[in-house]
Design a protein with these regions (language model features):
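PRPP-dependent phosphoribosyltransferase catalytic core
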Residues: 125-201
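Short, well-ordered alpha-helices that flank and scaffold nucleotide-derived cofactor binding pockets
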Residues: 38, 64, 68, 126, ...
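Short glycine-rich phosphate-binding loop at a beta-alpha junction
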Residues: 44-54
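Short, glycine/charge-rich flexible loops or terminal/linker lids adjacent to PRPP-binding catalytic cores
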Residues: 56-109, 116-120
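Active-site-facing substrate-recognition patch
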Residues: 1-45, 188-201
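Conserved acidic residues
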Residues: 47, 106, 136
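Short helix-terminating capping/connector loops at secondary-structure junctions
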Residues: 44, 73-77, 132-134
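Hydrophobic Val/Ile/Leu positions in short beta-strands of Rossmann-like dinucleotide-binding domains
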Residues: 51, 110-111
Length: 201
């Protein structure tokens, strides 16, 4: 956990939650999936998990948990697909023809590493709808918001877990208004420090 003034593409945040190990380490990814699956295993039929922001490892474990042999699990014994859209030259999310069939007519769970403003989630939701998928829910490691367009976001961590956490759209950023310079640029890959700052700790 780092505290400071972080700028993402869509928002400014007071903290950066480093979930790198959770996205890339076997044990932590499996644990994350074990928490998230509880929201869906007995209630939602899931055919495909659409992974955003490098969440494919967690998504793979999540698919395995959803499909485990459990007489009460909705997806028991099913083959759950894991796919990731790509950005075309215009910045639009697309699925290539060989992957589109895993979304079209399927019950889809959207998995995102972190949700702050919800804009990335909305773009992914629009992509899923365009390709004919039926969105069954949104799962995230961290989410600053409870819903995206009335779709609940089920997350492991929320702002309540981070004392003093603030997120805002760029024009409304209280840190900018207070004259605090940006410490780092952040995205789904990590963050890049712009200057040394004692507040980042």
């Amino acid at each position: 956990m780092f505290r400071g003034h972080f700028a993402t593409r869509h928002s400014h945040n007071s903290h950066y939650l480093d979930i790198t190990r959770m996205k890339h380490e076997y044990g932590m990814a499996a644990d994350a999936a074990g928490i998230l699956v509880q929201h869906y295993i007995y209630e939602k039929q899931i055919d495909t998990i659409v992974c955003m922001d490098g969440s494919e490892v967690i998504g793979t474990f999540l698919a395995g948990r959803l499909a485990k042999n459990d007489r009460f699990a909705v997806n028991s014994g099913r083959n759950v697909c894991i796919v990731t859209p790509e950005y075309d030259s215009n910045g639009q999310l697309i699925f290539r023809d060989n992957l589109a069939g895993m979304v079209s007519g399927k019950n889809v769970l959207l998995l995102i590493s972190t949700v702050n403003s919800g804009k990335t989630a909305r773009r992914a939701m629009e992509c899923i709808e365009y390709y004919g998928g039926s969105l069954q829910g949104i799962a995230a490691v961290f989410s600053a918001i409870a819903k995206v367009d009335e779709v609940p976001v089920m997350s492991i961590f929320s702002p309540e877990d981070i004392p003093g956490y603030m997120t805002s759209l760029v024009p409304d950023c209280p840190l900018c208004r207070a004259g605090q310079k940006i410490d780092a640029l952040a995205n789904s890959y990590g963050f890049s420090i712009l200057k040394c700052n004692d507040n980042m700790k």
